[in-house]
Amino acid sequence: MKKSIVYEIMETKSSMYLSQFRLWLCFIITTLVSLSSSTRWYDDHISLKEIHAEETFHFPKNFLFGTASSAYQYEGAYLTDGKTLSNWDVFTNISGKIADGSHGKVAVDHYHRYPGDLDLMEDLGVNSYRLSLSWARILPKGRFGDVNMGGIDHYNRMINDILKTGIEPFVTLTHYDIPQELEYRYGSWLNPQIREDFEHYANICFRHFGDRVKFWSTFNEPNVQVILGYRTGTYPPSRCSKPFGNCSCGDSYIEPLVAAHNIILSHLAAVNLYRTKFQEQQRGQIGIVMNTIWFEPISDSLADRLAADRAQAFYLTWFLDPVVFGRYPREMREILGDDLPEFTKDDLKSSKNALDFIGINQYTSRYAKDCLHSVCEPGKGGSRAEGFVYANALKDGLRLGEPVGMEEMLMYATERYKNITLYVTENGFGENNTGVLLNDYQRVKFMSNYLDALKRAMRKGADVRGYFAWSLLDNFEWISGYTIRFGMYHVDFSTQERTPRLSASWYKNFIFQHRALSKDDWCLKQKEDTNFFLI
C-alpha cells in the first residue's frame, strides 16, 4: 500500500475521531452549563419543581439580551472633543451634593475604553447594548450654537463598532443630562422653549445615526428627573420648597408639573418628527423609558387599594397616559385640578401613535397606604403633590417580596396600554462599596428572581421583547457617587481595570440556556467551527 494512501486513511480516521470528540465535548459543556444554572443560588424562593418549569422557558429568537449604561455615568471625557458642561458637570461640582464628593469627569472612561467594554459584552453573549448620547457633546449650546462634529464622529465610530460586534444599539436621547447652557439661558424644563431645543437635538441624532440605530427612546426616567430635580431638589437643577427640601428657590408643588408637561410635549415633538421624516426610510422604533415601582396596597381595604392606584398615577401614568391617551390620569386631575397644565388640540394631534414601546426600569416595590381618608404620620409623605399616598418598603417590619413587582408591573402596563410592546430597559442590584467583592451571590439571586418574574409575565401574555441588566460595569451612581456598585464587572477606579464578578458568568450562562437557539443547534454550530479548539 502506498504511503499516500496510508496517510489518507489515517487522516480520515483522525478527522472522524476529532469530530466525535467535538460532539462529546459539546455535550459535556452543555451539561456543565446546565448544572451551573442559577437554581443553586435561589432555591429558597421557589420549589424545585417550579425551578425546573422555569428552566424550560426559551425566549423568542429576536429577544434582546443586553446591558445598559448612560453617558454621564460611563463616558468621562467631560470636556473632550468639543463637549461643554452639562447640568451634571455643574451640579457635581457643588459641595455636598454627592455622597463621596465625586463626579463623572472620568467615570469609567467609556469614551476611550468602549472597544474593550464591547469585547466584554461580546463575551457575555448579549445581542444589544442600551446607551445614551450626551446632548452637551453633540450640541454644546443647544440650538443656539453649531453642531459639534467631534461628538458626532465619536458616536458614529461607536455605533459602527457596536454593530461590527454583532450587537444592536438601543439609544436614549437624554438620560438626565442636558447642556448647562439651556439652564443658564431660560431655565431648561420650566420653559416651553425646551421643546424646540429637544426637537432640534432629536433631528440631528436621527439624521446622523438613524440609518443604523433601530431603537430610540426619547427620555430615561423623566418621572425621577422631575421629582428629584424640582420637588426634593436632590438632582439638578436643585429646585424645591419646604417641606420637601431646603433649596434656595423653587416650588415643589407646581414646578414638577410644569417640567413634566414640557418633557411630555418634547417627547411628542420628537416622535412626530421621527414619524413624519425618518421612520419610513430608517425603519426604526421609538419609545420612552420610565422608572417603575410596583405599589402594593398595605391592606385589603378599599382606601388602600385606591391609594395604590393613586401612587401609580402620580409616578408612572403621569407621563404615559398623556402620551397614549392624550390626558393626565383621572386621579391627578381630581386632586390637582387647575394646577395641572392642559393640553391643546395641537398637542393631542401629535399624541396619536406616540409610542412604539415602553421601556420599564424595574428595581423595587413599595407598600401604599392611604393618606386621603386616613391619618398619616407627619413627615411620612402623603402630601397632595404625592397623591395623598404614603409609600413604604416595609410592612410590620418585613420587606415586600420585590421580584413579584416585576411580573405585576409588566402585566399592569400590558393591560392599561393595550398589549403594547415592552422592554425591561434596566434591572440590577447595587451593593455598598466595601472592597473588591467578586462573589456577588446577592446580585445573582436578585437577577434570577426578577428574570423568573419576567418569564411568568411573558407566559401570561406580556409582549416583552428585551431585558437589559444594569449594569456591565461599576459606575458613577448619581448622588451616591462611587459608594454603590451595580456592575457585573468590578472596576478599580484608580486604574480602570475591569474584573468579572460571579454575576457575569451567571448572566452569560443564563443567556446561553434561554435563547431560542437549541443546545443541539449550538453544538452543531461548534462542530462546524474550524477554530473550535484554538481557544
UniProtKB/Swiss-Prot annotation:
InterPro entries: Glyco_hydro_1, Glyco_hydro_1_AS, Glyco_hydro_1_N_CS, Glycoside_hydrolase_SF. Residues 1-38 form the signal peptide. It catalyses: Hydrolysis of terminal, non-reducing beta-D-glucosyl residues with release of beta-D-glucose. GO terms for biological process: carbohydrate metabolic process. Glycans are attached at residues 93, 246, 419, 432. One of its GO terms (molecular function) is beta-glucosidase activity. PROSITE patterns: GLYCOSYL_HYDROL_F1_1, GLYCOSYL_HYDROL_F1_2. It comes from the Eukaryota. Its EC number is 3.2.1.21. The active site is at 221 (proton donor), 426 (nucleophile). A beta-D-glucoside binds at residues 73, 175, 220-221, 363, 426, 470, 477-478, 486. Disulfide bonds join 240-247, 371-376. Keywords: Disulfide bond, Glycoprotein, Glycosidase, Hydrolase, Signal. Belongs to the glycosyl hydrolase 1 family. This is Beta-glucosidase 47. It comes from Arabidopsis thaliana (Mouse-ear cress).
